[in-house]
Amino acid sequence: MDDWKPSPLIKPFGARKKRSWYLTWKYKLTNQRALRRFCQTGAVLFLLVTVIVNIKLILDTRRAISEANEDPEPEQDYDEALGRLESPRRRGSSPRRVLDVEVYSSRSKVYVAVDGTTVLEDEAREQGRGIHVIVLNQATGHVMAKRVFDTYSPHEDEAMVLFLNMVAPGRVLICTVKDEGSFHLKDTAKALLRSLGSQAGPALGWRDTWAFVGRKGGPVLGEKHSKSPALSSWGDPVLLKTDVPLSSAEEAECHWADTELNRRRRRFCSKVEGYGSVCSCKDPTPIEFSPDPLPDNKVLNVPVAVIAGNRPNYLYRMLRSLLSAQGVSPQMITVFIDGYYEEPMDVVALFGLRGIQHTPISIKNARVSQHYKASLTATFNLFPEAKFAVVLEEDLDIAVDFFSFLSQSIHLLEEDDSLYCISAWNDQGYEHTAEDPALLYRVETMPGLGWVLRKSLYKEELEPKWPTPEKLWDWDMWMRMPEQRRGRECIIPDVSRSYHFGIVGLNMNGYFHEAYFKKHKFNTVPGVQLRNVDSLKKEAYEVEIHRLLSEAEVLDHSKDPCEDSFLPDTEGHTYVAFIRMETDDDFATWTQLAKCLHIWDLDVRGNHRGLWRLFRKKNHFLVVGVPASPYSVKKPPSVTPIFLEPPPKEEGAPGAAEQT
């Protein structure tokens, strides 16, 4: 290393000197000052632009005021001022206002917009099929009614005809089809659409799309139609845009006398549509009823809970029949509405009744179940002294002697602990199987559809263990379970005092109603005196059943029970048939017999200890299950019980529908 010499080409190494702290801070401060100057310059420019813009606005405003002073207009009220703010198209030579209406029809979606506001939009899957109808007030343009009629299903076209016939003349009608609306659109409905001026509606075909706007009793304002090219496809979507001229308020109002009843009527009829003569200008139907008082009315102070949802037209029909029943106490009626819907409350207010709304809890059948629980709890809170409550649904017609029926039988609930309820509905009481309005039965099932509930039963047993919101159970099926019923029975009439008219609901459609509800017999005779009411008590009823069986004529069991000739062509006789029933839950033969008798066959209803009572050809007809029923002892030794083989079950067949 001693002989090493540095290269003369390389610069000698020297340690780098650090920049002094003074120079470092001077550099930083110089950069910050430059940034500050830039920001200040930008702010000055922004303020300058703002000042220029404001000066221009002030000058424009002064110029406009000066021009207005040179050509002054007369003073205008508020409505006229609003008119001046409308678009130039609406300020034409005609003083009437005009609505912009858009209507859309397609396979999967419908919508209606009025002046840019969407008043209907339905694109939910597997819902909203059929013809959607909207009614607008011809003077204000506000929506008075929205309905959808699933005219793919039976009888929905009848409901649509009824609704459209009840709409007042002059109203604006809007129709649009989602998915399919022609399958059950019968001639009567087509004729009505033709009378409204529609050309495409009466010719509506399978899966066609259609949009229509017109005035009832007036001109058609727009219509579009697209025909389906094949059975497997739909018509093209159609979008109808049209103008709807509005009429004066004078043309849209009725001039009734200024009374408290008519003030209620006026409020109602200015908001909603589809209620027919209640809003007639010339001869409106009454909204106050004066049925005859019921002598010795045992249910005068029993609260009545009407369970309702968003079916206001059903509620209107139901309340009319309820308020027309002899012995009704309007002050004891409370309508419980599941949700904050306006129109059902409007119906309640029309009749001057009490209405209570509450927030829905859960979904589907659990929501209905929670609504019942909330309503029953509220009923007994409103009337803490009440021992009973009458429970009704919004889709029931109420018989004229409904309260008379309850008044004559309600003491049984107090005196007989073996009873679960009193119901106005007979599950097997069809037009061809019910005959005697004075006759009562004991049955092991809880029919519902107009029934009396004992407060002690609800507060001590049912309320504490009512199904919770997460359980998607039907409340009535739960109440029929052995754990709740505990061997108790219900009293029912042979001829029902309620009629289930609703065809739209959670577990209801047109097909189901046609098969199981439409042909139920409904009492229309006032003042029926029930016969031998005390014989419905537990021990007395057994005596009555044994008496009937002892007097009954045994039918020829070699004949087919499904044939009309199985029962003789007589009247006023009592007959008995014995069917195979190996155990208490063996209902195979009964179910097949119920099918061929065209009565309720989806589960077992209306039985008492393995015995069913009904009428055939105006004869009292008893059916006894052998050997499960204790009444099997009445079977003659020579008689072989009837056995009907159930059909083989198809794989993947859907389960039975349930009544609600």
From Swiss-Prot:
Catalytic activity, as annotated: 3-O-(alpha-D-mannosyl)-L-threonyl-[protein] + UDP-N-acetyl-alpha-D-glucosamine = 3-O-(N-acetyl-beta-D-glucosaminyl-(1->2)-alpha-D-mannosyl)-L-threonyl-[protein] + UDP + H(+)
Chain spans, region Interaction with O-glycosylated substrate glycoprotein: 473-481, 506-512, 600-605
Bias kind Acidic residues: ranges: 68-80
Membrane-spanning segments: 38-58
Cofactor note: The manganese ion interacts primarily with the substrate UDP-N-acetylglucosamine.
Cofactors demanded by this protein: Mn(2+)
GO cellular component: Golgi membrane; membrane
Positions of the UniProt region annotated as Disordered: 68-93, 634-660
Topology feature Lumenal, residues: 59-660
EC number: 2.4.1.-
Lipid bilayer topology: Single-pass type II membrane protein
InterPro entries recorded: Glyco_trans_13, ILEI/PANDER_dom, Nucleotide-diphossugar_trans, O-linked_mannose_GnT, POMGNT1_PANDER-like
Region (Catalytic): 300-646
Boundaries of every GG-type lectin domain copy: 97-258
Residues the record lists as Phosphoserine modifications: S7
Main EC class the enzyme belongs to: transferase
Keywords from the UniProt entry: Disulfide bond, Glycosyltransferase, Golgi apparatus, Lectin, Manganese, Membrane, Metal-binding, Phosphoprotein, Signal-anchor, Transferase, Transmembrane, Transmembrane helix
Biological or metabolic pathway of the protein: Protein modification; protein glycosylation
Cytoplasmic membrane side: 1-37
Tissue: Expressed at basal body and daughter centriole of photoreceptor cells (at protein level).
Stated role: Participates in O-mannosyl glycosylation by catalyzing the addition of N-acetylglucosamine to O-linked mannose on glycoproteins. Catalyzes the synthesis of the GlcNAc(beta1-2)Man(alpha1-)O-Ser/Thr moiety on alpha-dystroglycan and other O-mannosylated proteins, providing the necessary basis for the addition of further carbohydrate moieties. Is specific for alpha linked terminal mannose.
Name used for this protein in its record: Protein O-linked-mannose beta-1,2-N-acetylglucosaminyltransferase 1
Organism: Mus musculus
